[in-house]
Amino acid sequence: MPLIHINIMMAFIMSLVGLLMYRSHLMSALLCLEGMMLSLFILTALLALDSHFILASMIPIILLVFAACEAAIGLALLVMISSTYGTDYVQNLNLLRC
């Protein structure tokens, strides 16, 4: 396995550990999720280039679309929580009612 693949996997694992450690604030959780999605995007793009399979080149683009949707929903929740409660604690997510 090339060294770049190991580095990207380590970046994913570090983002996952950061998500598990700093889960009290929503902004920290969103940043860790974005780090995970970025490392997954780079890893799938590298694997698609290595495989020389035509349909494999669509997977990173689909992953990027899901990452953009996740970021938009996360930022909308962050704005809603911040304007309602004044803080970005994840425990306030249980208090939101539609």
From Swiss-Prot:
Compartment(s): Mitochondrion inner membrane
Q: Which residues cross the membrane?
A: 1-21, 29-49, 61-81
Q: Kindly give the Gene3D superfamilies that the UniProt entry links to this protein.
A: 1.10.287.3510
GO MF, one example? NADH dehydrogenase (ubiquinone) activity
- A GO CC term assigned to this protein in UniProt: mitochondrial inner membrane
* Assembly, per entry: Core subunit of respiratory chain NADH dehydrogenase (Complex I) which is composed of 45 different subunits.
What protein am I looking at?
Answer: NADH-ubiquinone oxidoreductase chain 4L
Name the source organism. Kogia breviceps
| GN (gene name) | MT-ND4L
